[in-house]
Design a protein with these regions (language model features):
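A short, surface-exposed alpha-helical micro-motif characterized by mixed small hydrophobic
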Residues: 87-89
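ABC-family P-loop ATPase nucleotide-binding domains
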Residues: 1-32
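C-terminal coupling/interaction segments
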Residues: 133-136, 140-181
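Helix N-cap at the start of a conserved alpha-helix in ABC-type nucleotide-binding domains
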Residues: 56-58
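ABC ATPase "signature
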Residues: 105-106
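Conserved H-loop
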Residues: 74-83
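Short loop immediately C-terminal to the Walker-B catalytic DE motif
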Residues: 51-52
């Protein structure tokens, strides 16, 4: 990476240079592998659970360096992760795979733009949601939240609230929908 040689990145992550690779902790092993990934200039870079074992500060540093690398050397970066909320703002295209089957493969904005969470008193939510494309729902006390696909949330009756669904909530809702099949 321009402006950030491997040595500088090593110092930023405080990687111990006096240990063998197999003697590194889980976190520092992850740091070693992600430094390798950040240092190559290839058309494709694959990161499989790159922040495994990293503390919040090191995860944040990795995400910043990932964006910097992309800005300096645009390429396709595949990031496989369970920490969806942490990377959601970095992801342009999302592929959701479950048990070897692709469930979704689309631009991230396209996946979440048409999904809404609507919540309020259970009876009011049920009446309003009837006939809509509800793909998951949850109840907490007397409040109910449904996640719906498509528009049509402009006509909410009094007492209901809507908000956009983020990528992690979309993912969880999709998995719950799959579980019900």
């Amino acid at each position: 990476m321009e402006g950030a040689s491997g040595g500088i990145i090593l110092k930023q992550f405080e990687l111990p240079l006096n240990k063998k690779i197999n003697g590194l902790s889980t976190g520092y092993g992850s740091i070693f592998r992600l430094i390798l990934g950040l240092s190559v200039n290839t058309p494709y870079v694959l990161f499989d659970e790159p922040v495994l074992g990293l503390d919040a500060q090191h995860r944040d540093l990795f995400y910043k360096l990932l964006v910097q690398k992309y800005a300096e050397h645009p390429c396709t970066m595949v990031v496989s992760t369970h920490l969806i909320a942490e990377v959601a703002d970095l992801i342009e295209h999302t592929v959701i795979i479950r048990k070897g089957r692709i469930l979704q493969d689309a631009p991230t904005e396209e996946l979440t733009a048409a999904c809404w969470a609507v919540s309020g008193p259970a009876g009011v939510v049920d009446s309003w949601a009837a006939g809509r494309d509800v793909f998951t729902s949850s109840v907490l006390g007397g409040l109910k939240t449904v996640c719906i696909r498509g528009g049509g949330t402009e006509d909410l009756p009094a007492g209901l609230e809507r908000r956009r669904v983020g990528l992690q909530e979309y993912f969880i809702s999709l998995m719950e929908e799959e579980d019900q099949r």
